[in-house]
Amino acid sequence: MSIEQEVIDIVVEQLGVDRDDVNSEKSFVEDLNADSLDLTELIMTFEERFECEISQEDAEKLKTVNDVISYLEKRKS
């Protein structure tokens, strides 16, 4: 499974949104109505699934689905 697909799966699962409503351009807060607790849970899930640590500083920069995909792809390489 690609990083993009796995990130989208996590977002759908964690935020309870329809898969059709999620694409790489969506903002977690503005488009997908995530609150601060949702964002914290998303970051924790990304860390667990991708076996990496995301600093608080980096986490604050991850505003869209694509931000997370790009970040994780860079970390994997």
Swiss-Prot record:
4'-phosphopantetheine is transferred from CoA to a specific serine of apo-ACP by AcpS. This modification is essential for activity because fatty acids are bound in thioester linkage to the sulfhydryl of the prosthetic group. Pathway: Lipid metabolism; fatty acid biosynthesis. SUPFAM superfamilies: ACP-like. Keywords: Cytoplasm, Fatty acid biosynthesis, Fatty acid metabolism, Lipid biosynthesis, Lipid metabolism, Phosphopantetheine, Phosphoprotein. Pfam families: PP-binding (PF00550). PROSITE patterns: CARRIER (PS50075), PHOSPHOPANTETHEINE (PS00012). One of its GO terms (molecular function) is acyl binding. It is found in: Cytoplasm. One of its GO terms (biological process) is lipid A biosynthetic process. It comes from the Bacteria. Residues 1-76 form the Carrier domain. The modification O-(pantetheine 4'-phosphoryl)serine is found at S36. GO terms for cellular component: cytosol; membrane. InterPro entries: ACP, ACP-like_sf, PP-bd_ACP, Ppantetheine_attach_site. Coiled coil: none annotated. Carrier of the growing fatty acid chain in fatty acid biosynthesis. Belongs to the acyl carrier protein (ACP) family. This is Acyl carrier protein. It comes from Protochlamydia amoebophila (strain UWE25).
